[in-house]
Amino acid sequence: MAELDDFFAKKDKKKSKNKTKFVTADEMVKNLEDGTKREVVKPKKPEVAAGGVAVVGENENSGTKVPESAPPVEEEWKEFEEEQRKDYSGLKIGQLSTISSARSRTAQESSESQAARVPSAPDGGNYNEDDEDSNGYDNADVNKERVGHGPWKKVVPAEEVMQIPVPVEVEKHSSKTYVSPALRYSQQAGSGLGGGPTGGALRPRRAAPDITNTEFFPTLSAARPEEQRKKKNEPAFEEVRHGSRFQRVQESTAAPVAASNRFQSLDDEAS
């Protein structure tokens, strides 16, 4: 019996181990809900007591006091705080850097120019700004010179562009109409140019044609009717007048048949 109990006890242990390996979906949901419901317990910060001594939370009931020089207890849970991102899109860094560099250059150059232009006092002492009227110097003139000073404020004279005159091309009107060779020769002869068939002989100018001349302008009324030639073996047509037809008498035109022998040679052979 003891052996059977041990055997079943081992089986129960194996079953319990197998059950713990697999977790159902319901159990996972419950664990997640329990985790979200748990409140984060923050440790209390040490309170500073009178006399400059800090008291830790666990040691408050016991009354033990921890000196301030002791290292602070690290908190187990730290709250995550998102840093607010600043918008630097409108910041002009390049412009600020150029302005600062330009100001430093102007200040340096102005100090150098001022040191070079400060005249010595007549008594051999240092120059004083109060003596400007007596010496004839004015800060306004110096400031005007400083304004135009510097490579970024130099006015570059505009280069004069030489305008090259463009030759105007005269369009040649070429006539696209066809001119016969005879007319070309006549035009060349009229203009005094040679090369015609007559060797450049002068010809009379073109005159208006005579419209009444029937030789150049024939008309239909002046045309003579020509008799049409009849072709051979062409059938004749009957002429119709007053709606009646001429009835021609049919005459027998057939030649009489000769039954007698017209050739005497046959008679000679028969005899």
Curated annotation (Swiss-Prot):
Record PTM Phosphoserine, positions in chain: 134
Query: Which residues lie in Acidic residues bias regions?
Result: 73-82
Keywords from the UniProt entry: Phosphoprotein
- Protein family according to the UniProt entry: Belongs to the CDV3 family.
Q: What is this protein called?
A: Protein CDV3 homolog
Note whether Heme occurs among the keywords.
no
| Stretches the record annotates as Disordered | 37-151, 186-271
Instruction: Quote the biased-composition stretches of kind Basic and acidic residues, using this chain's numbering.
Output: 37-47, 224-242
> Spans of biased composition, class Low complexity?
48-61
Q: Where is the composition biased (Polar residues)?
A: 95-114
GO cellular component terms, semicolon-separated: cytoplasm
Which source organism does the UniProt entry give? Drosophila melanogaster
